[in-house]
């Protein structure tokens, strides 16, 4: 899950207490991005690869990994819940980057498994967030709020990864 930097509302959509809150936030990725184009490109690339591998390792823990749009890791192993006072997600738009594909509006319970449904609910409740889900079925989906359709937009991108 990617949430805006400095935002705190995302906490309303996460079961508390968070089992693996990162405090202070892991900021190595953010710092490395700021150093892009540094004098020693090879060393920078190696440092960036190590930082990415460290964050990728956190995704192996059951639950969501949360980071800011500035690349600070806030938590991992987080359990997503519906935000208090907000309705459950009932429909969303689904698209694929395939020529001739048209958007479909579906019930999110029919799309993927628990990870996909949790991500869709998170974005439904936290409209400034983006969720990236790699499902066990091989699907890779990006969830974001669409102000045009006023609903969650799930964009299946696994065909781009082939």
Placement of each model-derived feature along the sequence:
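Divalent-cation
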Residues: 1-162
């Amino acid at each position: 899950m990617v949430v805006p930097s400095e935002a705190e509302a995302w906490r309303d959509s996460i079961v508390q207490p968070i089992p693996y809150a990162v405090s202070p936030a892991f900021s190595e990725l953010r710092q490395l991005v700021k150093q892009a184009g540094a004098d020693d490109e090879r060393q920078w690339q190696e440092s960036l690869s190590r930082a990415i591998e460290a964050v990728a390792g956190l995704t192996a823990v059951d639950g969501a990994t949360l980071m800011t749009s500035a690349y600070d890791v806030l938590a991992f192993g987080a359990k997503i819940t519906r935000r208090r006072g907000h309705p459950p997600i009932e429909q969303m738009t689904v698209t694929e980057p395939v020529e001739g594909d048209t958007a479909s509006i579906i019930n999110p319970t029919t799309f993927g498994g628990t990870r996909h449904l949790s991500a869709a609910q998170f974005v439904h409740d936290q409209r400034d967030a983006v969720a990236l889900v790699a499902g066990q079925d091989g699907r890779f989906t990006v969830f974001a709020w669409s102000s045009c359709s006023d609903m969650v937009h799930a964009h299946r991108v696994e065909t781009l990864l082939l």
